[in-house]
Swiss-Prot record:
MF-aspect GO terms: ATP binding; glutamate-tRNA ligase activity; tRNA binding; zinc ion binding
Protein name per UniProt: Glutamate--tRNA ligase
Keyword ATP-binding: yes
Oligomeric form and interacting partners: Monomer.
Catalytic activity: tRNA(Glu) + L-glutamate + ATP = L-glutamyl-tRNA(Glu) + AMP + diphosphate
CC annotations in GO: cytosol
Entry keyword DNA damage: no
Organism: Mycoplasma genitalium (strain ATCC 33530 / DSM 19775 / NCTC 10195 / G37) (Mycoplasmoides genitalium)
Gene3D superfamilies from the UniProt entry: 1.10.10.350, HUPs
Length: 484
């Protein structure tokens, strides 16, 4: 059996996006499922659009997710270089070789001419295509242009009567007629290869066997098959085009939509666990056989199958991601949870100094992502307790609140062990004496300790206070009720 070799080939023109991440994950899982090799190649020839941290963003964030390349610019193998910018001479030579074989030609058309043709096609309700002005240019005219050092691109001659077909790994048989294509540029005027030309040469040189990528590349595949044919490359990878990822409105995720979190760095900053995010992204377009929702990396590799990859749009459901992440958070040990959550903890409770760990643990079973801890603390604790105001509120609601609290303080004072279970039992026993239960029992106590009517388990909150502080707080409240 041939060794499966897949690749992920991003351009460092931006930061790692969920769409590119899903592509990388699927290629990684396919390779590893068959004990193959996963390669990361950087398509960095668009120097004007490349950003400084573009390459690091790709590698650092994929590594954070557990997606590690067998070969890359940082871990080169025998199929380099892994930066397209280091291979420009190879592309250029092959482009000129195609001219010699009459399979490509120099195009001297100006940008203005091409733009004029494009606008005219649009005005005539036609798909803009290159009209072949230079395809059959006489050799004397070519020589004249070259003597004047006129700039030119190199275009591939597309056979309009041909058909370009492949059995798509995701979508089945796809056929695109040559008449739907145009003579594409394979080498730009600055001598740099275009995407479609360079990617064919790279995939061939690196012996890539399978290519999974976004649906937007379907038309590119037809062009690339034409390039494979022109170059005489017999070993052609299998192509699969993944589903479109859509937002809640059904529109394709757009990197320009700043309202939607969709870059991996953003998810890191907001406190999503890498295992949870990997799990979620792997389910975007891949449907496990047994409707299982939770997979670690090993399980993903074992279960991944192209037969379960679908072409229907994949809904990027942030609520599902939060649900998955919450489940992963719950599975953390208390120590691991606090080490995780402490990275995001900004809000402090001024009357519970040095209790950050205990306070954070109150929310372990309800938090969906790291930064949410601050919102939950703000909702559950006041920064300063206004005893008189709270006493007045409770006094109006519960006329016998003072007697109840006096007995509660006395009973709590008698506890030998200051634990949530014992505290809860004591509250219920005292409440029963005064025929208090539910809201009437717990809300006044919660107001005392948090200044809020709702929040985490009350007994665990009280446990965070040492016994003396808790009882003193209740007594302050009792004294305040004397005002009413």
């Amino acid at each position: 059996m041939e060794k499966i070799r897949t690749r992920y080939a991003p351009s460092p023109t931006g930061y790692l996006h969920v769409g590119g991440t899903r592509t990388a994950i699927f290629n990684f899982l396919l390779a590893k499922h068959f004990n193959g090799e996963f390669i990361i190649r950087i398509e960095d020839t668009d120097t004007e659009r490349n950003i400084k941290e573009g390459i690091n963003s790709q590698f650092d964030n994929l590594r954070w997710l557990g997606v590690i390349a067998d070969e890359s610019v940082y871990n080169p193998g025998n199929y380099g270089p892994y930066l397209q910018s280091q291979k420009l001479a190879v592309y250029k030579k092959l482009a000129f070789d195609l001219i010699e074989k009459n399979l490509a030609y120099r195009c001297f058309c100006s940008k203005e001419k091409l733009e004029s043709d494009r606008k005219q096609a649009i005005n005539n309700h036609k798909t803009p295509k290159y009209l072949g002005h230079c395809r059959n240019l006489h050799s004397k005219k070519i020589t004249n242009h070259l003597e004047k050092n006129d700039p030119f691109t190199i275009r591939l001659k597309i056979n309009n009567e041909a058909e370009y077909s492949w059995n798509d790994l995701v979508r089945g048989q796809i056929t695109i007629p040559g008449s739907a294509l145009t003579d594409i540029v394979i080498l730009k005027a600055n001598g740099v290869a275009t995407y479609n030309f360079a990617v064919v040469i790279d995939d061939y040189d690196m012996e890539i066997t399978d290519v999974l990528r976004g649906a937007e590349h379907i038309s590119n595949t037809a062009y690339q098959l034409a390039i494979y044919q022109a170059l005489g490359f017999k070993r052609i990878p299998r192509f699969g085009h993944l589903s479109v990822i859509v937002d809640e409105s059904g529109k394709k995720l757009s990197k320009r939509d700043e309202k939607t979190t969709q870059f991996i760095e953003q998810f890191k900053q907001q406190g999503y666990l890498p295992e949870a995010l990997l799990n979620f992204l792997a389910l975007l377009g891949w449907h496990p056989q047994y409707n299982q929702e939770f997979f670690n990396l090993k399980q993903l590799i074992e279960n991944f199958s192209l037969s379960r990859v679908v072409s229907a749009p994949a809904f990027f459901d942030i609520k599902k991601l939060q649900w998955i992440n919450a489940n992963y958070i719950k599975q953390l040990t208390d120590n691991a949870y606090f080490n995780f959550i402490d990275n995001y903890l900004d809000v402090k409770v001024d009357y519970l100094k040095d209790k950050n760990r205990e306070i954070s643990l109150l929310f372990k079973n309800q938090i969906t992502h790291g930064v949410q801890i601050n919102e939950l603390i703000r909702e559950s604790f006041a920064t300063k307790i206004g005893v008189e105001n709270l006493a007045k509120k409770s006094h109006i609601l519960f006329k016998n609140i003072k007697l109840f609290l006096e007995q509660l303080a006395k009973s709590l004072q008698g506890l030998e062990e200051w634990k949530a279970e014992q505290i809860k039992t004591t509250i219920n026993k005292v409440g029963a004496v005064f025929n208090l239960k539910g809201k009437q029992l717990f809300m006044p106590i919660r107001l005392i300790f948090t200044n809020k009517e709702h929040g985490p388990d009350l007994a665990h909150i009280i446990e965070i206070f040492d016994k003396e502080s808790a009882i003193n707080l209740i007594k302050q409240f009792i004294n305040a009720t004397n005002l009413f």
